[in-house]
Amino acid sequence: MGPPGRKAIKKNLSIIKKENSIDFTIINGENAADDGRGITKVIAEELFSNGADVITSGNHIWDKKETTDYINFENRLLRPANLAEGSPGNGYGVYFTKNDKFKIGVINLMGNVFMKKTDDVFEVAKRIKRKIILKKNVDFIIVDFHGEITSEKMAIGHFFDGVTTGVVGTHTHVPTADTRILKKGTAYQTDIGMCGDYDSVIGMNKENSIKKFLKDKDAVTHFPAEGEATLSGIIIDADHDTGLAKKITRLIYGGSLTK
């Protein structure tokens, strides 16, 4: 979320990757811009240089106009696959880890409930499942499901159970406590939270957010809180033979959420 989140990535991600022998890193970057809305080419390249292998997104993907051009030639930046047909960029892709050791499928989807108009997420998910197949054309598959409500996220988790390595929820900015491996072997968490200042209202300045709710005439457009960010996410340890999860660990690193 904004500059504090990017600062936390720059400061801590390389340490976390080294300590945990991480092969592949996915960051949802749709709130990475300075105002917390969208992402730019410069910021995406900053995240790549600081350790991201793929950047996923959600409903804020088009908040910066330049993204519509950039996403067409940068295949490591994904937008939700169930946006309207003909949208710029791609909603899923296949990538290699360093030294071409593993082949990773990454799928970016967005919920239909309480979100901007999107194509039916389950219909699109069915089509993608036929194209990216665990242990046939990829070693591992991760799904970023950007959604508003818990029930829809849980449903998509069970829908992908046993055919993907992990399904992780994004969008609500607060990490949930249901980190687990589903019955057929897919790692799951309803929402992995944000990399941002948690002494805030979902990453935005708390005083201004309260003014907004009170309809105070002095309230201004929401802007990110500026305190120390917590780096929030998950680490999945997967079985190379099956492509399924062996372990999922919730990651809460630094900032006010750990104090």
Where are these regions (language model features)?
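Acidic, metal/ion-coordinating pockets
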Residues: 1-259
